[in-house]
Amino acid sequence: MNSSSTLTVLNLTLNASEDGILGSNVKNKSLACEEMGIAVEVFLTLGLVSLLENILVIGAIVKNKNLHSPMYFFVGSLAVADMLVSMSNAWETVTIYLLNNKHLVIADTFVRHIDNVFDSMICISVVASMCSLLAIAVDRYITIFYALRYHHIMTARRSGVIIACIWTFCISCGIVFIIYYESKYVIICLISMFFTMLFFMVSLYIHMFLLARNHVKRIAASPRYNSVRQRTSMKGAITLTMLLGIFIVCWSPFFLHLILMISCPQNVYCSCFMSYFNMYLILIMCNSVIDPLIYALRSQEMRRTFKEIVCCHGFRRPCRLLGGY
């Protein structure tokens, strides 16, 4: 948000023309591209689907003791971050509907505060997602290259402390975002954080997969080699690769929008790109919808627990039968 903003995420979803730090900030859009409009119902539908899916993920992790491991705890943290995006967008959509239909009449100053909260929730969500993905990456790295010592290095207590630190840091970032919403340096800091964590994760992946093949050959000769554990570890690494790839695809346009908004807000071509901001919000919400599908696709245990919760909650005997398939 800058000094000229009156409404950011709210106005963007309504296709309004005010400027904002998370908004389109396109003053020359009439010379380039008209702002892309997306129905409010699309935002609400994706938000509700994402909310239900990620509640299901968290419920599965809580319900199934076989999922009580550091990796799935970090997956739960990622699900909470995804759920935060869906909640903020659903709340935003309801607020827009109430304002448009005059069911809610509030002062512009209070609307600005609501906007700040929405922006802060997006900030918290993206930082929490990045930190959770980084934690999963480190966990998979330890699992693959320190398999025999994994349970001594990554305990449930340590993973809990890591998650607590992640969310303390993310909430602090959100508070700073609200306090200094008029400063562009907050956005620069967010962009820098995104690319820094992305660099660390990609570097870790390159290192991990370059060494993985030689490492597998070396430990295969060991009498203590556990092929099942190794396959499980590699499967977890592939799952994380999919999560990271989807995260990059869905969030990169949003951060490119922020970069262009700061560097060339008056440029016609930059303005044209920024006119599609609503689509970038949709991509962010799609990320939170796709992640649970990846969990279900890659984890048989997660699929079984989903089936128990969705199809036969409260009917334990049929659930056990279904779990056998």
UniProtKB/Swiss-Prot annotation:
Name its species.
Answer: Mus musculus (Mouse)
Q: Report the protein's function.
A: Receptor for MSH (alpha, beta and gamma) and ACTH. The activity of this receptor is mediated by G proteins which activate adenylate cyclase. This receptor is a possible mediator of the immunomodulation properties of melanocortins.
Q: What is the lineage of its organism?
A: Eukaryota, Metazoa, Chordata, Craniata, Vertebrata
Specify whether Transferase is a keyword of the entry. no
Q: Kindly list the residue ranges recorded as spanning the membrane.
A: 38-61, 74-97, 115-138, 156-179, 187-211, 240-265, 274-297
Give an example GO molecular function. melanocortin receptor activity
The record's PROSITE patterns line, in alphabetical order, gives: G_PROTEIN_RECEP_F1_1, G_PROTEIN_RECEP_F1_2
Family annotation (PANTHER family): G-PROTEIN COUPLED RECEPTOR (PTHR22750)
Point out the gene that encodes the protein: Mc5r
- Tissue expression from the record: Skin, adrenal gland, skeletal muscle, bone marrow, spleen, thymus, gonads, uterus and brain.
Task: Could you list the residues that carry lipid attachment of the S-palmitoyl cysteine kind.
Answer: 311-312
List localization entries. Cell membrane
* Protein family: Belongs to the G-protein coupled receptor 1 family.
Specify the glycosylation sites in chain numbering: 2, 11, 15, 28
Main location, first listed in the record: membrane
Going by the entry's taxonomy, the superkingdom of the source organism is recorded as Eukaryota
* SUPFAM superfamilies in UniProt: Family A G protein-coupled receptor-like (SSF81321)
Describe its membrane topology: Multi-pass membrane protein
Q: Which Pfam families match?
A: 7tm_1
Query: Any idea what this protein is called?
Result: Melanocortin receptor 5
**Gene Ontology biological process terms, A to Z:** adenylate cyclase-activating G protein-coupled receptor signaling pathway
Topological domains (Extracellular): residue ranges?
1-37, 98-114, 180-186, 266-273
Q: Does the keyword Transcription regulation apply?
A: no
Q: Detail the disulphide connectivity of this chain as listed in its UniProt entry.
A: none
